[in-house]
Structures are given as structure tokens and as C-alpha cells.
């Protein structure tokens, strides 16, 4: 297991109370040895005007996952902040849920890189994101 902080899914989800994460309906669903996953509904909260999943919602899911994964790689007195987010959208989603899967690409002392892949309910890749974070403290 790579994580330096050991949080349960319930503890992870509690961090979302009264935030944009909760407003978008993002829920952490799996914490593995080197992976963090979450689901987000595709509904009126996450649609763009044409009834499809908004690219910004996919980006919010990615940044949520990468930032929390980054935080779990810090020690007491440290935190992470996002420095760069890149998203490539592959296919539209109009309903249901999407699942984000976050894994590390680079874990340095001062910076981290995370890959977050967003899948639809059929397991098709909808969006590929890369998040860079800086470790502070």
C-alpha cells in the first residue's frame, strides 16, 4: 500500500460535506493499494446545456480524486495543491453515473502526478485526465 495517511471510505466521504464535491454528488467508492475511485451522477447537476456530461464536471471529478490521493501521500503538517489539470474527452455521457479511477504517475517529495480515467457505466473510457500537485509544508 502506498498511502501515508490511512483513511476509511467513510472518513474520505465525510471530507466532502458542505463542499462542491457533495453538491456534484461525488462519492468515494474504492480505496486500493495504489488506487482511489469515486462515482459521480450524470444528471442536472453535471449536465451541460445540451444534456451531456459537462467537461468541467469530469475535470472536477478528476481534481477531487487526484487532490485527495495526493493528500493521502503526505505526512502531518503537509498538504497538496493542484498545479495543472489536463483533460481529454473521448466520448459523451448523457445519463447514469461515471466512475473515476486515480493512480499515481510520479510521487516525488515536492510534486506528484496523477492519472485519472473516467469511465461510463459500460466501462468505456470517456475522459483521461492528468493532475499535477505540489506538496507544501
From Swiss-Prot:
Required for optimal enterobactin synthesis. Acts as a proofreading enzyme that prevents EntB misacylation by hydrolyzing the thioester bound existing between EntB and wrongly charged molecules. One of its GO terms (biological process) is enterobactin biosynthetic process. This is Proofreading thioesterase EntH. SUPFAM superfamilies: Thioesterase/thiol ester dehydrase-isomerase (SSF54637). HAMAP family: Thioesterase_EntH. The gene is entH. It is an enzyme of class 3 (hydrolase). The lineage of its organism: Bacteria, Pseudomonadati, Pseudomonadota, Gammaproteobacteria, Enterobacterales. Gene3D superfamilies: Hotdog Thioesterase. Homotetramer. Dimer of dimers. Interacts specifically with the aryl carrier protein (ArCP) domain of EntB. Belongs to the thioesterase PaaI family.
